Amino acid sequence: MNRIDVHHHFIPPAYVKAFNSTPGDPSGWHLPKWTPESTLSLMASHSTRTAILSLTAPGTSIMSNSPVESANLARQINLYGFQLHQENPTRFGFFASLPHLTPETIPSAVEELAYALDTLQADGITLYTRYSGTGYLGHAAFAPLWEELNRRKAVVFIHPTNTASDAQNKPEMVNPKLPQPIIDYPHETCRTAVDLITSGTISKNPDVKIILSHGGGTLPILATRAANLLYDAGLTEITPETFLEQARSFYLDLALSGNVGNLELLVGKNGFAKPGHVLYGSDFPYAPVETINKYVGMMEEFFAQGGDKEEVARGAAAELFPRFRIEDNKEMIPQNRL
């Protein structure tokens, strides 16, 4: 099948060092062990030809107290991603990391964006759903970044991060056994997506191609509610039709979201997603292999009843990332090759 996995994380040595120098991930999730070989092994088990690697949250924001260290970490991560692609050009792509975003660091973020896309030939840029001290991605401070991304017609991979903290700057959890990635992350994705729509960011930057993690989180469920309530209550001039059109402009990956019911919601009859806007994702190595295997099985079950499995598995992603089209690269990677 030669899948393209657009939601596949790597953990560069520089990030491990930075992570271990801090209190850790404020979402409550642990840092798993990872090697390029472990990624290739997972890819082989699911006939995945290419993984687009990205750094999960909190990413360079783990060094948010030091703009210089955050920028240096972003550069190290991007050089590592470039190295992996050079060593395995058909197996690995990567989304570049940016420094922690604040109004003051936007210029350096734009510089890193240019370096990553022009010099390192990154496949796109990773952004997180919100940044402490600024807010969600529709904030006016981020406008210059979106303008540059739009000018370049770039691909942006949006990954959820920890929710806003309490007054003591301590992330709030439902209980100690429910780290935020379990149930909070999907709604964080919805929050930033709706913020991008209502702030006018989407309408002003129509050429950016945005991938939302985890099937768009709760956006497919809440989009119609938000579209109508906002307009009917006089809270926005965006008509419900325009709101829903913009909500459907996002690309949606299936990491931890490829169960039968969710696939029916996204790509079934009258599905939320636009044709060609649903992409395969695994969420390795943060999702256990056992969980990934279950979701691949559920996807197979759904597509056994019909639907364009090839488009979701690789076709839609190949349109976004032309360098990984099989016809461009000729050689087919054997499914059991590491």
Curated annotation (Swiss-Prot):
Main EC class the enzyme belongs to: lyase
GO MF terms, alphabetically ordered: carboxy-lyase activity; hydrolase activity; metal ion binding
- Gene Ontology CC entries for this record: cytosol
Query: What InterPro entries does the annotation carry?
Result: ACMSD, Amidohydro-rel, Metal_Hydrolase
Q: Which Pfam families match?
A: Amidohydro_2 (PF04909)
In this chain, Zn(2+) is annotated as bound at 7, 9, 159, 283
Q: What is its EC number?
A: 4.1.1.52
The keyword Zinc is annotated on this UniProt entry? yes
GO terms for biological process, alphabetical: secondary metabolic process; terpenoid biosynthetic process
Q: What does this protein do?
A: Decarboxylase; part of the gene cluster that mediates the biosynthesis of macrophorins, isoprenoid epoxycyclohexenones containing cyclized drimane moieties. The first step of the pathway is the synthesis of 6-methylsalicylic acid (6-MSA) by the polyketide synthase macA. 6-MSA is then converted to m-cresol by the decarboxylase macB. The cytochrome P450 monooxygenase macC then catalyzes the oxidation of m-cresol to toluquinol.
Homology family? Belongs to the metallo-dependent hydrolases superfamily. ACMSD family.
Q: What else is known?
A: The macrophorins cluster contains a single gene insertion (encoding for the terpene cyclase macJ) compared with the yanuthone cluster that produces the linear compound yanuthone.
Q: What is this protein called?
A: Decarboxylase macB
Q: What lineage is this protein's organism placed in?
A: Eukaryota, Fungi, Dikarya, Ascomycota, Pezizomycotina
